[in-house]
Regions:
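Mature N-terminal segment immediately following signal peptide/propeptide cleavage
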Residues: 37-45, 56
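Conserved active-site tyrosine of GNAT-family acetyltransferases
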Residues: 50-55, 119, 151
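N-terminal secretory signal peptides and thylakoid transit peptides that target proteins
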Residues: 1-18
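Residues at or immediately preceding the N-termini of alpha-helices
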Residues: 7, 47, 111-112, 149
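Vicinal oxygen chelate
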Residues: 24-35, 57-110, 116-147, 160
């Protein structure tokens, strides 16, 4: 084999190995293309009480015949009305889920004193907190826990 042929074979091998490695890297990086969280859905039982509760807490809501949507920034929680989640024809849900089945953590941008005052104004009893908890931002925050009228757990986390 000539020197030129050897070099060509070497370069071909290196290019092939590089392409394979690059392809594997791209595959590994592209394996999870999830870029954010849009919404979640949970069943609700006490529609009027739930709507009043989330409004008292200052959330923006929309309603339709199937759900009440509570907006948190660019995400939302869809609370399915009983007529929706109890309908056997509605299968796009967790079949065993019944109220209360939610455990939601909201990021609070104010102080602990402001949170406590807001909850008191809304007539909401604090179940626990503030206590330190690990959060989704991969650091510790201060959490305060309450329950909504259906019994779902709401956590308000404050990051320093």
């Amino acid at each position: 084999m000539s020197t030129t042929s050897s070099r060509r074979a070497f370069v071909k091998g290196m290019v092939a190995a590089g392409a394979a490695a690059g392809s594997a890297t791209l595959h590994a990086q592209g394996a999870n293309r999830v870029s954010g969280f849009d919404h979640m859905a949970v069943p609700m039982q006490n529609t009027d009480a739930m709507v009043a509760f989330y409004r008292r807490l200052g959330f923006q809501l929309t309603e339709n015949e199937n759900a009440v949507s509570v907006y948190i920034g660019t995400q939302m929680i869809n609370f399915h009305r009983p007529t929706r989640w109890q309908d056997p024809a509605f299968t796009l849900r967790a079949p065993a889920a019944k109220p209360p089945s939610g455990d939601f953590c909201f990021v609070w941008s104010g102080s602990a004193m402001e949170l406590k005052a807001m909850l008191e104004r809304a007539g909401v009893k604090i179940e626990l907190g503030p206590v330190d908890r690990a959060g989704g931002r991969r650091k510790t925050g201060s959490s305060t826990y309450v329950r909504d009228p259906d019994g779902n757990l709401l956590e308000f986390m404050i990051y320093a």
